[in-house]
Amino acid sequence: MSDSHLTAFDKASKAGFIIALGIVYGDIGTSPLYTMQSLVENQGGVNQVSESFILGSISLIIWTLTLITTIKYVLIALKADNHHEGGIFSLFTLVRKMSPWLIVPAMIGGATLLSDGALTPAVTVTSAIEGLKAVPGLSHIYQNQTNVIITTLVILIVLFGIQRFGTGFIGKIFGPVMFIWFSFLGVSGFFNMLGHLEIFKAINPYYALHLLFSPENHRGIFILGSIFLATTGAEALYSDLGHVGRGNIYVSWPFVKMCIVLSYCGQAAWILANKHSGIELNPFFASVPSQLRVYLVSLATLAAIIASQALISGSFTLVSEAMRLKIFPLFRVTYPGANLGQLYIPVINWILFAVTSCTVLAFRTSAHMEAAYGLAITITMLMTTILLKYYLIKKGTRPILAHLVMAFFALVEFIFFLASAIKFMHGGYAVVILALAIVFVMFIWHAGTRIVFKYVKSLNLNDYKEQIKQLRDDVCFDLYQTNVVYLSNRMQDHMIDRSILYSILDKRPKRAQVYWFVNVQVTDEPYTAKYKVDMMGTDYMVRVNLYLGFRMPQTVPRYLRTIVQDLMESGRLPKQEQEYTITPGRDVGDFRFVLIEERVSNARQLSNFERFIMQTKASIKHVTASPMRWFGLQYSEVTLEVVPLILSDVLKLPIKELVPVEDSEA
């Protein structure tokens, strides 16, 4: 990687600063909407809190943001970039060669990130709309929670509905809106604090530790379940690394942290000033003058939509990476924008919409949603910590130091996990069930692939080279196609899937001028696009290894077109001049892609567990995208063939011929 690229990645700019605000900080930036409300309501209301409770709560928030977000993610995780890309799957590709079991924390972390993230639009948008209860002139309408739910659902329908068209046209305003949002958080919090400067004492971690064991804290250690809401968006700082660059996050995070800490302190000051008033409004909205609340609700709604959009886009990216790493079923992916990073996965979009909408309808209020929110993300953070430990060791950190540092973060996050475990009975079970379902699908897909590689026979292509040449020259067979292309799962040392040779020679002899055997390998680098060619000493058999990054689309025909041109220009492949064509000088013949669907024909060798995995994977494949779409073959000539996936030698069944009686008497 060149120094200029590294400099650009680490360099900050004014434009990058604004862009980072709109992409990275939506989730963590909207946490002030509901974190203090959750703390106060779980304590019994505004009139049940004391100064020591408030100081302890703010101290816990400050030090949680410092330890987890600043130290772990900003100072440590951001250095673990995979060619400028971040996120749990990028981190996994950096360390997966160190141990085969690391696929487990990667799958669990990805699944919990997806499942818990499905609650983010529900919590943030509902919290913002509930602010209308504090707006004079509208409060009488929105005191009825049904109206809040209806408004929230309308916003969600529009938000998820526009995903298919791409969001680049509105993405340009995200940064400026979030800059205004964070500026408002900081300014309003600062002015609210002026009457209660004792809030600054919360910087001392003594107040945080004291509150955990204080009798004034009605929830004990379980208060950390509400505190954790302040840092649920920390994972996004790492996941969105590739979108904005490390330098812009380094510069923007201090500004963001200052603004949200000031907001929490301002809400705390308002609570101390009104703890005997009996007001039961969300401190975030109640701490602002009533004449400004309608503008604040509008701004909060925009911020909530931006946070939700970041979550949706992040989910598409996460699933896309999992598919290319072959740990998730293939779903149709489209690119509605000009940028390859702007992708859209219809199935995932509408699953997220269904989960989010059901969450709003089932929990109804943001307070009830908060009770279930954050449980799964603690698991994601633990899984990231495990992978980070291996990364530090790989980069030369002394193992004892890497173990100690990551053990500290694992302990902190495990305590948060235990504190959030109480949420399981308050709705967190729904998120856990969704996460388990995603992990199950990932496991089945990954394990099924391993079983195929374990049992399926492969053959040496060199042993059949002469047969293929005879077939190519045998005019008794009609020309099947000028170029026939097979996609192979394996092509090492001239070994190829048995099913491909079965298709060429046994299923129906396919005469062609050139036989192409293409293998797509996903690399650990995100944006690789390279290939290797082996002509096998012929001009009619071509082995192609495509090396594509885990964030690159696997549109095989587009790459193959370039490869064919390169081979013809170098003289390694004869030109295929066309007699009939509307394109003068066309020297490439027609192509047909043969896709092979392998079905288990004899599973005698499989254990019951392996048979269950293969059958389940086959069932899942019925609802996934076809390989034709995944490899970009929609506009190509494609033949789909079903061949037996022979896992063991087929046993002959005993049978006897019935001999006619008259013949036996003779």
Curated annotation (Swiss-Prot):
Write the record's keywords in alphabetical order, separated by commas.
Answer: Cell membrane, Ion transport, Membrane, Potassium, Potassium transport, Symport, Transmembrane, Transmembrane helix, Transport
- Topological relation to the membrane, as annotated: Multi-pass membrane protein
InterPro entries annotated for this entry? K+_transporter (IPR003855), K_trans_C (IPR053952), K_trans_N (IPR053951), Kup (IPR023051)
Write out the GO cellular component annotations.
Answer: plasma membrane
Q: Where is it located? A: Cell membrane
Which residue ranges traverse the bilayer? 16-36, 58-78, 100-120, 149-169, 173-193, 221-241, 253-273, 294-314, 343-363, 373-393, 399-419, 424-444
Tell me if Transmembrane is a UniProt keyword of this record. Answer: yes
Write one Gene Ontology MF term.
potassium ion transmembrane transporter activity
Enumerate the catalysed reactions. Answer: K(+)(in) + H(+)(in) = K(+)(out) + H(+)(out)
Pfam families, sorted? K_trans, K_trans_C
- Is Ion transport one of the keywords? yes
Stated role = Transport of potassium into the cell. Likely operates as a K(+):H(+) symporter.
Q: Family, per the entry?
A: Belongs to the HAK/KUP transporter (TC 2.A.72) family.
What is the designated name of this protein?
A: Probable potassium transport system protein Kup
Q: Which organism is it from?
A: Streptococcus pyogenes serotype M12 (strain MGAS9429)
